C-alpha cells in the first residue's frame, strides 16, 4: 500500500508523468484528473465511492487545495491499486460523473430561474416598472358603460354584455402621430394613450378585457376596451400603437385576428381598479365620472399596470 500525505504535486510534472501515476493509488489518479481540470474551484472535496471500486467499503475522501500552481492533498484513507478498476475507466467514469454533476447543477440553477419566472406574476416585476407608461394614472378617469343602440353610416350597433363572445376578422391600429387620437377622450370618458394596452370595439362593454390573437404569427395580448370603433368595412377591432407593436403588425397596418371577451378577468379587473357597475339606467345616465373609491396610493400600480398583470398571468408579452 502506498500512502502519501500532504504531498505537493506541480500541475505540469503531473501531466508529464501521467504514466507513472497510473501505477499508484486512486489518490494520484484523482490528482491526475484534477490536474486536467485546472480551472476548477480552489477548494474541492470528493468522495470516490463504490462507483469506482470492485470491493465492498472501497472508498477514499480527498480534499484538494489549489494554490500557486500546486495541488495539496490530504488523504484520509488510501487503497491498493489492485482493488480499483482500470485507470482509464476511472478517468472516464470520474469525468462522466463530474459532467453529470455539472449538468445537475446547471439544471438546478435553471429550475431556480424557471421557479422565479413562475413566482406570482405580481412579484416578477415591480409596480414602478409596469407603470412606466402611465405612472400618474393611478385612478381610472373613465366610467363603466354599455350604452344604448346607435347608428353609424346607416348601420345599427347594439352594445351588450355577453357571457361568451369571440370574433374573427381584421384589426387595425390607431394612435399614430398624424391621426390625432392620442390624448383624446374615449367613448366612456377615459383618455386615449397610444402607449397603453387598449382597444376600441363596437359593442362590448367599456371597459372590459379582451384577448387579441394575431392569426398570422399567433402572438397574443390582452387589452382593455375603452372606446368605440372601428367603423371601416371588415374591421372588428382597433388596437393601440403599443398593442400593434406587440402583435407585430404595426408596419402592415392591418392583420387578421381572433378576439375573445374575458368576462371573469374583466370582473376581477374592475374590482382591482375599484370601478363599480351602475345599478340602474338612470344612475348610469346622470353619472358621467367614474364610480370607484380611489386606488390605494401605496401600491402605486397604474391602470396599465393592472392590464399588464393580467397579461403576465397568462404568460403573454407586455412589450414588443
Curated annotation (Swiss-Prot):
EC number, as in UniProt: 4.2.2.-
Signal peptide region: none
Origin: domain of life: Bacteria
Keyword Zinc-finger: no
Entry keyword set: Cell wall biogenesis/degradation, Lyase
Annotated GO biological process: cell wall organization; peptidoglycan metabolic process
Family of the protein in this entry: Belongs to the RlpA family.
Name of this chain's protein: Endolytic peptidoglycan transglycosylase RlpA
The organism of origin for this protein: Rickettsia prowazekii (strain Madrid E)
